[in-house]
Amino acid sequence: MASDLESSLTSIDWLPQLTLRATIEKLGSASQAGPPGSSRKCSPGSPTDPNATLSKDEAAVHQDGKPRYSYATLITYAINSSPAKKMTLSEIYRWICDNFPYYKNAGIGWKNSIRHNLSLNKCFRKVPRPRDDPGKGSYWTIDTCPDISRKRRHPPDDDLSQDSPEQEASKSPRGGVAGSGEASLPPEGNPQMSLQSPTSIASYSQGTGSVDGGAVAAGASGRESAEGPPPLYNTNHDFKFSYSEINFQDLSWSFRNLYKSMLEKSSSSSQHGFSSLLGDIPPSNNYYMYQQQQPPPPQQQQQQQQPPQPPPQQSQPQQQQAPAQGPSAVGGAPPLHTPSTDGCTPPGGKQAGAEGYGPPPVMAMHPPPLQHGGYHPHQHHPHSHPAQQPPPPQPQAQGQAPINNTGFAFPSDWCSNIDSLKESFKMVNRLNWSSIEQSQFSELMESLRQAEQKNWTLDQHHIANLCDSLNHFLTQTGHVPPQGGTHRPPAPARIADSCALTSGKQESAMSQVNSYGHPQAPHLYPGPSPMYPIPTQDSAGYNRPAHHMVPRPSVPPPGANEEIPDDFDWDLIT
């Protein structure tokens, strides 16, 4: 006896049976085997037998005193005494008073109890009076199979559980589950679960643009109509565990093993379903990622330099974001204000932005910009200098064939755009200098040597000479399309508005911002400049005549002289 008790306490034979399928099958077999109404829980006061009738002997016993029956039993006796098995409220009152004289002089309280039982007890159902039946009031009858989910004016009694298995089974028909595409379980053999629903696929295609929502919805609807509605439970054999896996020697270990096996099967099935859908999604192309890349082979160099053309409506935001993201992404210090390139970028620059020329990866030989001082890129006032067309680049020298026969990688105004200038530096760094005759580009080699020796803090005329030399070099190598005109020699010392930068105190004096948010007229100082150029109002051309180099002073707004002078020693930072 003790061994049987111990085995019953440690037995987990009931564990495999705790599934939704077993519960539904048990409820179905119980409802089919038992009599009508036997599988439900009756409310308090319900008659034990809905077909019970009052005999004459029992009526004679209760002629003098109060009957021992409940109000629900009295209503059942009254309705079953009728040949049509239905009565109106007044007929029920009359039958009770005729068979039990106690209620004739008991007042009206018992009539209220009769009405409450008819309304709240699920054993009684109201039947509308037919049109051909004259009279007043509806009929009441006994409901042998009451609908538990039928709405009542008041909540049911406390003894009837709201979360009973009977109510859960009645609340989970296919109509309630089919309404939501995410909650539906898949049919057998389909590991993708709810990802095949038209609703989820359509919403997912709006975010990625790689799935046709209409085609998937049509295919899903046709498949559902052909295979029928999905079952209420998962019939996948991967989620079934073997009874032999359970170790009865250690009960806690068996529970842990069972949990681990079910968790692994569910995770593997979900990963397989998501990977089958996400496998065809192409990776997104982000043209603004600043990362160090290896030089690609010559066959792929032209393809990488010319990315696919974005939509026209996105070209202008990319052009505006390119100068702002360049310095801030490298040094980590955002500018004081975002420069707008609408008024200073030439038509060729906008065309270059529309063709997808974003900020290229930063060269490894460039030091961080914060090492030269805490400067921030700024832009001149939009009305300080008018935007002009860039000069034509230097043509190809006569009698010399292009060194590189690849297509043109940059437009003719490559130096007017900071992104194209960065890309040109990167391209020069990728070239194989051993295969190029360096005697033709002595000026460029000398400028690069000076830049490396001075850690790229060149003077303004050195920067201008470097731009001219680089333009000539790219034209000879075939990266810049040659145009008509004579070859212009490198210009002398210039005010390089397109390529020169200032650092330290010169930046604070050059780009002071007044109280209205507009930069003042810059004060031009010769001196060292940092490693990379910055787009300004005159970024279109650096070879313009001398009368265009002098900036037109702008009228300072009121309150400009009230600014606090910058007396901080910026040299201490470096």
From Swiss-Prot:
The keyword rRNA-binding does not apply. SMART domains: FH. It comes from the Eukaryota. Residues 26-61, 125-233, 267-408, 537-574 are annotated as: Disordered. PROSITE patterns: FORK_HEAD_2, FORK_HEAD_3. Residues 45-54, 191-206 have a biased composition (Polar residues). Residues 28-39, 207-223, 267-276, 315-335 have a biased composition (Low complexity). It is found in: Nucleus. The modification N-acetylalanine is found at A2. Residues 358-370 have a biased composition (Pro residues). This is Forkhead box protein J2. It comes from Homo sapiens (Human).
